[in-house]
């Protein structure tokens, strides 16, 4: 038994060194490191199948969101929907969002943030301009090339016991690369325009461009403007950051005229976390049921935690905020720490709306800090709305990472976030979302909010 354990550890060390040895010389994230797992994170067949089918559901949700916004503008759905989604946006951006040229355009990369809780999956938000495409592509490629006889998998408690032999990562070695390439159709040249705000992701996108090969993909600074007819642009910058992308106006004009292909489209509605609050709003249930279909409608409600838009508009004295039984958002400050299993976060169109910025877990804050966050959310409603979301604590998983300093495998109890990447190819109703790969971020058990950090393990997922 001792000899077998030692042999297993030697094999794990070998795999971890192999992974580290494949790191591109330019790195993947500027100034960011993570813990290396010797194995993929194993989901089990049932969860893997759930993720494979989830892309269809989320694409249909985006279609429904797009339609809801348009119908709200036309007066065929409640006017307050568009009014809330438009809060804080400049008129030029709203004009683009409402332009006939972009009428049916949807993001072609869909990445949900999923937590594995004791009650199943929880989708906390959707990202239409996600980082991690290159990282996940590199992880898939690297772990697919581990020595076949040694492959194993880290797994969460619901997974079957891992066996020796081949464990294929979800999406395969090149699923992320082929998926990303597919979203640009027949474009001969694709310009990936990266803002300074997103500059940390430049190395991973440069790696993607190099792997796809040739001169098809080009990494461009925000000042780049030499676009040719028939080319495509991948917008790797958030819409709040347009002031720092000097030629964003030209990009949008060329896309509107049909001279270039642009994704994601210049539609801030898809960068708003309040979409989940609209999903939960009972006034809109019939719309969602009709546009999603009963099966997808029910699945979204199983996955999405209850979400509220923190709108300080006065309620009638006999009315209350659903589920919370509060008659005024100021009363949110009076909840006990135990009652504050709630996440408060900026909805969108803000430098604080991505990553772990602008995210407050009520049960993890003092009364004073929680009160300050609530006051800020109420005060900023007109130009930077916030949402409140029920917090479902991720369950514990067993993981391990390799300590290169001490040359040993370190077991770790952790909590995991799954980020599947869906790539949408095809046009209009023929468009389909394909799963390219799944990134697991495993943070130590004492971390309440899961995000990329030096103490986190990044690993691709296998079934």
Question: Which functions belong to the PLM regions below?
Answer:
Residues 1-463:
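Preference for protein termini
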């Amino acid at each position: 038994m001792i000899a077998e354990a030692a042999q297993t550890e030697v094999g794990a060390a070998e795999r971890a060194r192999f992974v580290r040895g494949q790191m591109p010389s330019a790195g993947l994230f500027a100034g960011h490191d993570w813990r290396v797992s010797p194995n993929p994170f194993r989901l089990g067949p049932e969860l893997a199948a759930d993720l494979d089918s989830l892309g269809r559901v989320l694409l249909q949700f985006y279609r429904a969101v797009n339609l809801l916004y348009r119908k709200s503008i036309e007066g065929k759905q409640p006017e307050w929907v568009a009014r809330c989604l438009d809060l804080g946006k400049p008129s030029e951006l709203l004009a683009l969002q409402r332009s006939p040229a972009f009428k049916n355009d949807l993001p072609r990369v869909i990445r949900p943030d999923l937590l594995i809780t004791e009650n199943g999956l929880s989708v906390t938000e959707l990202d239409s301009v996600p980082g991690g495409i290159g990282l996940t592509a590199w992880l898939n490629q690297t772990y697919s090339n581990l020595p076949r006889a040694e492959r194993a998998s880290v797994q969460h408690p619901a997974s079957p016991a891992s066996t020796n032999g081949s464990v294929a990562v979800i999406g395969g070695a090149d699923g992320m690369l082929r998926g990303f390439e597919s979203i640009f159709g027949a474009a001969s040249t694709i310009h990936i325009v990266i803002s300074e705000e997103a500059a940390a992701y430049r190395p991973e996108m440069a790696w993607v461009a190099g792997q796809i090969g040739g001169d098809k993909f080009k990494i461009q600074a925000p000042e780049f403007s030499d676009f040719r007819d028939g080319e495509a642009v991948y917008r790797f910058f958030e819409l709040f950051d347009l002031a720092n992308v000097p030629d964003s106006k030209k990009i949008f004009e060329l896309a509107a005229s049909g001279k270039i292909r642009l994704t994601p489209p210049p539609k801030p509605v898809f960068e708003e976390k309040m979409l989940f609050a609209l999903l939960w709003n009972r006034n809109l249930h019939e719309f969602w049921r009709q546009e999603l279909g009963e099966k997808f409608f029910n699945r979204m409600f199983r996955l999405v935690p209850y979400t509220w838009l923190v709108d300080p508009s006065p309620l009638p004295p006999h009315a209350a905020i659903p589920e919370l039984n509060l008659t005024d958002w100021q009363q949110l400050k009076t909840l006990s720490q135990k009652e504050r299993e709630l996440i408060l976060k900026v909805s969108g169109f803000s430098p604080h709306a991505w990553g772990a910025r602008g995210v407050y877990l009520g049960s993890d804050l003092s009364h004073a800090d929680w009160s300050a966050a609530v006051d800020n959310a109420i005060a900023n409603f007109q130009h930077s709305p916030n949402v409140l979301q029920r917090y479902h604590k991720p369950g514990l998983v067993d993981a391990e990472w390799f300590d290169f300093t001490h040359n040993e495998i370190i077991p770790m109890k952790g909590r995991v976030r799954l980020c599947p990447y869906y790539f949408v190819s095809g046009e209009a109703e023929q468009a389909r979302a394909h799963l390219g790969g799944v990134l697991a971020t495993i943070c130590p058990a004492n971390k309440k909010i899961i995000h990329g950090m030096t103490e986190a393990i990044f690993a691709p997922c296998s079934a």
